[in-house]
């Protein structure tokens, strides 16, 4: 069994936690990477991400895929879920939401590599896809295609 002391600083895992009111209030937590000497990819998929249009307050929906190659740290998944959920009542344009997620994770984790693909569902007839990446993929690490097809409507 892993040394439980390395998880002592986690405040959200293992108990009831309220959804934060905004991304700024959300607490992202990290844990030590037990495989820090090995390069490998981690993927999180949020197919029902929501935020609000900052002008109309109408809901916006996206399928978000986060891929990263961790260094010394892993993001704690419940804190990531709560962070992503905190956008539900947050007003921001698609581009801002998408890039902010990537930058916040980079700031927290200092990963070797990170990519966010945000595939926004159409509103006003125009789908918007936003991509953020910290640099080229690492040699020798398998990074699968994100698997989200271009929106075609009834096409």
Curated annotation (Swiss-Prot):
User: What are the record keywords, sorted?
Assistant: Cytoplasm, NADP, Oxidoreductase, Queuosine biosynthesis
One BP annotation, GO: queuosine biosynthetic process
Task: Answer yes or no on keyword S-adenosyl-L-methionine.
Answer: no
* EC numbers: 1.7.1.13
Q: Where is the active site?
A: 53 (thioimide intermediate), 60 (proton donor)
Q: What class of enzyme is it?
A: oxidoreductase
MF annotations from Gene Ontology = preQ1 synthase activity
Q: Which family does it belong to?
A: Belongs to the GTP cyclohydrolase I family. QueF type 1 subfamily.
Entries under NCBIfam families matching the protein: QueF-II (TIGR03139)
Entry protein name: NADPH-dependent 7-cyano-7-deazaguanine reductase
Provenance organism: Ruegeria pomeroyi (strain ATCC 700808 / DSM 15171 / DSS-3) (Silicibacter pomeroyi)
Question: Which gene specifies this protein's sequence?
Answer: queF
């Amino acid at each position: 069994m892993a040394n439980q002391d390395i998880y002592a600083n986690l405040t959200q895992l293992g108990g009831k936690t309220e959804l934060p009111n905004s991304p700024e209030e959300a607490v992202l937590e990290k844990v030590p990477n037990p495989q820090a000497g090995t390069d490998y990819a981690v993927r999180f998929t949020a197919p029902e991400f929501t935020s609000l249009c900052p002008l109309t307050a109408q809901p916006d929906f996206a399928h978000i895929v986060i891929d990263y190659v961790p260094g010394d740290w892993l993001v704690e998944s419940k804190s990531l879920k709560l962070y992503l959920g905190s956008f539900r009542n947050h007003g921001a344009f698609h581009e801002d939401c998408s890039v902010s997620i990537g930058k916040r994770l980079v700031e927290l984790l200092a990963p070797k590599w990170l990519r966010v693909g945000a595939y926004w569902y159409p509103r006003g007839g125009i789908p918007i896809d936003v991509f953020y990446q910290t640099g080229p993929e690492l040699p020798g690490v398998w990074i699968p295609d994100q698997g989200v097809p271009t929106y075609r409507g009834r096409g």
